[in-house]
């Protein structure tokens, strides 16, 4: 590597060079020549061809630089210089290519054809290369390096270790059965359960025995018969579903015949197509087609002019008569109905309306229904309940009359059910027993019958 030398060495070398130049000038005898274009050209050519200037520069720089060992910094500087020179060279080449004359040439048929052929060839070659390399990529056949294999094993072991740690942490708590508080709690729970069981058993034993009574035996027999009937019906239904049914559509003969019919229809269709092939030809430039096309355009223009004359003089805000406005209106209507149905299916259908009772329309309908109910109630009260133990006068309030009417209706229904359903089933209904005792006895019998 060449590096500059100190100042004293430079001065000495310069003095020696000056002395040598003076000696050379003294030796060479100069002759005047006529300066013309040929002489200038010759001088320039000789300067370019000969290496005189190179030798002079070499002699001038001689002893000014000395060779030293390469250091990392010097190597870095050399590499950077090489990269910088390459970047400058590429930049100049790109600038020259962008300003080349070939780019400004007019496109000819041959150049366009050559460009298209080259593009097609590049696409064909790329596709062939892609098809050839499909399924044979290097990534699929790449061997696993030791680092990747080591990382996979470490990840697998770490996942197992963490999973086991979490599992052990969740199962660390184990209850001790020999603790005094647990023993005491179990004993108390057993005592409470025994007491409740005995209490319930005593209540059951206090009830009168119903085993051996005729009505109870009859109910047991009826329940057995009904269970047998239901079991037979269920068995018959299951056997009907599982019984063998002949399905002609699923037979092999029918499927074969159907397949043959399909093949025959395809063959007939192909034969008709081959026979009629070439008989029909649609010519867009035929006189008949052009005549029909002209008539259609004339008719459309006549209709458009009629609509225009009809709507002439009307304001531009009235879009009802125009076909585009009508089509947009119908489309908007259909879209709104579709959106409303979607919202109804998603949000409203199947859900209870929360704010429906707060709307004015609903409140109005509710008020009207209340008035109609009061009117119907008063009419029924005057027609049916009057003369049945209650005097109707203007001094009696509507609330008292309604209360008395409801009590009479409930007593009537209760007595009718009691006489028709419960009487004759082991209980004598007399006028001396209280209504509360009769109702209690009836409820007990009904519960016993349901239990049986």
Swiss-Prot record:
Annotated Acidic residues bias: 11-23
Family annotation (PROSITE patterns): NEBULIN
Cited SMART domains: NEBU
GO MF annotations, alphabetized: actin filament binding
GO CC annotations on file: Z disc
Pfam family, one: Nebulin
Nebulin repeats: 29-63, 64-98, 101-135, 138-172, 173-199, 206-240, 263-278, 279-313, 315-349, 352-386, 389-423, 426-452
Superkingdom to which the source organism belongs: Eukaryota
Keyword tags: Actin-binding, Cytoplasm, Repeat
Positions of the UniProt region annotated as Disordered: 1-26
Subcellular locations according to the entry: Cytoplasm
Physiological role: Binds to actin and plays an important role in the assembly of the Z-disk. May functionally link sarcomeric actin to the desmin intermediate filaments in the heart muscle sarcomeres. Isoform 2 might play a role in the assembly of focal adhesion.
Oligomer and partners: Interacts (via nebulin repeats 1-5) with DESM (via rod region). Interacts (via SH3 domain) with XIRP2.
Name recorded for this polypeptide: Nebulette
